[in-house]
Amino acid sequence: MQMSEWRGAARNAKYGDSVKPADLLKPLLAGNDMGLMSEAGVPGVADPGAELVLAAHKMGAQVKPLVGPSSILLGLMASGLNGQRFAFQGYLPHDTHERTAKLKQLEIESRKLQQTQIWIETPYRNTAMLMACINSLAPQSLLCLGVDLSLPSEMITTLSIADWRKRYPNEAACASLQNRPTVFLLLA
């Protein structure tokens, strides 16, 4: 079986512009089964694989989701936060000011609705995201980090923002989180 890497049409520049969903799905037209895997989540959920799935539907192919681990749901299950009411936000803004504003907005929504807010971040920005949470959220708000979920190096920790501040007083202190797939969960 041949494996191909897909990062989405906008993200595939390093592989050339010739890689399009229809090109990768040609084996379907030939009657072959295909599968879609994600690095640390669920294909098609906050994942460029959604483009491939939509293209498969447009081709008339049968699309069948398979049971498997979802870092988003695993994080929620292990967080101890509200699992009855939750919202997945995908990726938050990269810009420092926009990210801080979004975090404060999510905290307000979480408090108002008693709803767990869930998001993910590109692993190389984990420390910046954690520091943004520590520096902008209320001390009593609860934050869970689900790091390397389902791997031997897994770490799942839920603490108040005040306790996160004590554990990681600066960005250098949280360097061990950098470049590790992480799910962030917030309950205000």
What does each of the following model-derived ranges do?
Residues 4, 54, 79-84, 136, ...:
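Short, hinge-like loop/turn segments at secondary-structure boundaries
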Residues 6-7, 60, 83-86, 115, ...:
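Short glycine-/polar-rich loops that comprise or flank the Walker A/P-loop
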